[in-house]
């Protein structure tokens, strides 16, 4: 990412600041760029786990994306937690209105404490429609296992899972160790 880039983050809010939109804002700002946000859910969480998840209405997610991008055209979009198929549909629809070549998807599915953050219908839609739009997909090991229906224990398993994600339609894959 070039300094002074404008990045739209579409993700959940983490009350502890360790993940989600808060972590993305810190990273983008530290790299000298400008962060904009569209919040998909508000979570009450800390380092020990997730207490609650409050979804933002789909229409408001769509409005946040389009209204922000109408004024400040993003150079890149980073997508995190999309908790339902309706949210994924709204994000796909909004992306069709925004011409951005750099789309990074971090398919947030499981919180560090183990709480599931996305339903099976949404996982299937993510695989069928959204992954192929991404410049880069960055699942962690548990997320890559869910997306590919494989078990990852060794580096070779990560490579196999990355190839399966490319078969699904991903352009580039970075499987994180977490």
Where are these regions (language model features)?
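Glycine-rich anion/phosphate-binding loops
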Residues: 15-19, 82-93, 117-121
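Glycine/serine-rich anion-binding loops at beta->alpha junctions
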Residues: 7-29
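Glycine- and other small-residue-rich loops at beta-strand/loop junctions that grip anionic moieties
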Residues: 13, 79-80, 115, 176
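Conserved phosphate/ATP/ADP-binding segment of small-molecule kinases
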Residues: 120-178
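Juxtamembrane transmembrane-helix boundary motif
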Residues: 80, 94-122, 129, 133-142, ...
């Amino acid at each position: 990412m070039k300094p002074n880039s404008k990045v739209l983050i579409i993700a959940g809010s983490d009350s502890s600041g360790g993940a989600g939109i808060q972590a993305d804002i810190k990273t983008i700002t530290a790299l000298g760029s400008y962060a904009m946000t569209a919040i998909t859910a508000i979570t009450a969480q800390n380092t020990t786990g997730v207490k609650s998840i409050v979804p933002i209405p789909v229409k408001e997610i769509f409005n946040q994306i389009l209204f922000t991008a109408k004024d400040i055209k993003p150079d890149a979009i980073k997508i995190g937690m999309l908790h339902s198929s309706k949210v994924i549909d709204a994000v796909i629809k909004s992306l069709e209105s925004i011409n951005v070549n750099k789309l990074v998807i971090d398919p947030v599915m499981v919180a560090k404490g183990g709480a599931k953050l996305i339903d099976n219908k949404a996982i299937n839609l993510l695989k069928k429609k959204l992954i192929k739009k991404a410049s880069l997909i960055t699942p962690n090991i548990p997320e890559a296992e869910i997306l590919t229906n494989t078990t990852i224990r060794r580096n070779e398993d990560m490579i196999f899972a990355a190839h399966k994600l490319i078969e699904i339609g991903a352009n580039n894959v970075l499987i994180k160790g977490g």
